[in-house]
Curated annotation (Swiss-Prot):
<feature type="binding site">
    <location>
        <position position="75"/>
    </location>
    <ligand>
        <name>substrate</name>
    </ligand>
</feature>
<feature type="binding site">
    <location>
        <begin position="102"/>
        <end position="103"/>
    </location>
    <ligand>
        <name>substrate</name>
    </ligand>
</feature>
<dbReference type="InterPro" id="IPR036441">
    <property type="entry name" value="DHquinase_II_sf"/>
</dbReference>
<feature type="binding site">
    <location>
        <position position="112"/>
    </location>
    <ligand>
        <name>substrate</name>
    </ligand>
</feature>
<feature type="binding site">
    <location>
        <position position="81"/>
    </location>
    <ligand>
        <name>substrate</name>
    </ligand>
</feature>
<dbReference type="InterPro" id="IPR001874">
    <property type="entry name" value="DHquinase_II"/>
</dbReference>
<feature type="active site" description="Proton donor">
    <location>
        <position position="101"/>
    </location>
</feature>
<protein>
    <recommendedName>
        <fullName>Catabolic 3-dehydroquinase</fullName>
        <ecNumber>4.2.1.10</ecNumber>
    </recommendedName>
</protein>
<keyword id="KW-0456">Lyase</keyword>
<feature type="active site" description="Proton acceptor">
    <location>
        <position position="24"/>
    </location>
</feature>
<comment type="pathway">
    <text>Aromatic compound metabolism; 3,4-dihydroxybenzoate biosynthesis; 3,4-dihydroxybenzoate from 3-dehydroquinate: step 1/2.</text>
</comment>
<dbReference type="Pfam" id="PF01220">
    <property type="entry name" value="DHquinase_II"/>
</dbReference>
<dbReference type="GO" id="GO:0046279">
    <property type="term" value="P:3,4-dihydroxybenzoate biosynthetic process"/>
</dbReference>
<dbReference type="GO" id="GO:0019631">
    <property type="term" value="P:quinate catabolic process"/>
</dbReference>
<keyword id="KW-0672">Quinate metabolism</keyword>
<dbReference type="GO" id="GO:0003855">
    <property type="term" value="F:3-dehydroquinate dehydratase activity"/>
</dbReference>
<comment type="similarity">
    <text>Belongs to the type-II 3-dehydroquinase family.</text>
</comment>
């Protein structure tokens, strides 16, 4: 079981609850973070979170997680479709991660169909609304082991 999880939310996710609620729902980012924190607490998992609209800030936080975090749950937002830098950071720190998207990116505009992260992710969850975060944490808790322990 993962003992520590870093939740990363990328650009524009600070607008959850007000930005295009017909696509992203009415749940706010503080509600998502509180729910994730409570879930991790129930599972005895150390939880941390960052949201930034700046790619470099997210990359720096991923670098800081190296050796300190067992798993990353990431909703990269629009960086999904554009950021080789984010991909390289995740691969470079060798921390297993689960990619989350609130909407089903494959039912949206064609430019949203490609992810620079998916082929490196342990799992990809999309289209489940904010429940996707809960599912990602549950997956990480059950299937991602701390370094040095055998993976399932």
């Amino acid at each position: 079981m993962a003992k520590s999880i870093l939740l990363i939310n990328g650009p524009n996710l600070n607008l959850l609850g007000t930005r295009e609620p017909s696509i992203y729902g009415s749940t706010t980012l503080p509600q998502v973070v509180e729910s994730a924190s409570s879930q991790c607490s129930r599972l005895s998992i150390t939880f941390s979170h960052i949201q930034s609209n700046h790619e470099g800030v997210l990359i720096d936080r991923i670098h800081e997680a190296r050796g300190n975090v067992d798993a990353i749950v990431i909703n990269p937002g629009a960086l999904t479709h554009t950021s080789v830098g984010l991909r390289d950071a995740l691969v470079g720190v060798d921390i297993p991660f689960v990619e989350v998207h609130i909407s089903n990116i494959h039912k949206r505009e064609a430019f949203r169909h490609h992810s620079y992260l998916s082929d490196k992710a342990e799992a990809v969850i999309c289209g489940l609304g904010t429940y996707g975060y809960e599912a990602a944490i549950e997956y990480a808790a059950r299937h991602i082991k701390p370094k040095g322990e055998a993976q399932l």
